[in-house]
């Protein structure tokens, strides 16, 4: 008589279409092999209440879950895979055109697989959150780097430092929208080296005396007129 121990079961596999209502076929197996990994072939739907209940049941395992989740909006996917963790290998594809950086960060914490963000055309977020998306976790997303970015404020009406704006502009070829903290023309010009005329930046010059060439160069860094109310004298040559 051959015997086996439940501890020997390392992975439970099933096709997405055969998992049963609320993933009963998976949960029944997990009731026996409680620490097994779960691998689902096919694509798990994630739209209805029943779909979400099935995914939640699968993610309740103590092991790693490997699965492809149907494409969807970031907010919906966050709800659908709430029980997932960074060790799970969930393939996620976004359908959003506009998405919050916080949602991207949240999804990234739920999977070890790079998230497909090809549909995204605009990202909104604070500098801290955008930095997590574009710098800290850059490899966690695919197809990012050509979308527009709107930098929001931690405190309303508080401008963003020029260096922070530039770090985001450097990460995308899209348009960057932000209110830049006031500074001297020379300092702003040096800090905003990766911005250009497509960017929608509110740039406020803090000088009372400025060089014409610096003002002209800064004007080429934004699609908006410069705010130069503090400037009383401009030095330069007649062109």
Language model features: what each stretch is:
Residues 1-239:
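General marker for long, soluble alpha-helical cores
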């Amino acid at each position: 008589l051959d015997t086996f121990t439940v501890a020997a079961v390392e992975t439970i596999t099933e096709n997405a279409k055969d998992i049963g209502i609320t993933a009963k076929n998976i949960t029944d197996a997990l009731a026996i092999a409680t620490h097994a990994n779960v691998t689902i072939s096919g694509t798990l739907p994630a739209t209805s209440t029943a779909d979400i209940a099935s995914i939640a049941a699968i993610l309740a395992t103590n092991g790693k879950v490997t699965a492809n989740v149907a494409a969807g909006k970031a907010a919906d996917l966050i709800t659908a895979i709430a029980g997932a963790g960074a060790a799970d290998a969930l393939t996620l594809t976004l359908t959003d055109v506009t998405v919050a950086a916080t949602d991207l960060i949240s999804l990234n914490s739920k999977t070890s697989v790079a998230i497909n963000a090809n549909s995204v055309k605009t990202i909104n977020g604070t500098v801290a959150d955008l930095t997590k998306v574009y710098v800290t976790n850059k490899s966690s997303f695919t197809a990012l780097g050509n979308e527009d970015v709107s930098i929001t404020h931690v405190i309303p009406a508080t401008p963003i430092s020029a260096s922070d704006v530039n770090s985001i502009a450097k990460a995308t070829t899209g348009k960057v929208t932000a209110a830049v903290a006031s500074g001297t023309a020379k300092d702003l010009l040096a800090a905003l080296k990766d911005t250009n005329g497509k960017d929608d930046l509110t740039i406020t010059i803090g000088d009372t005396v400025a060089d014409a060439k610096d003002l002209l160069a800064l004007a080429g860094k934004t699609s908006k007129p410069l705010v130069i109310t503090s400037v009383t004298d401009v030095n330069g040559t007649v062109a």
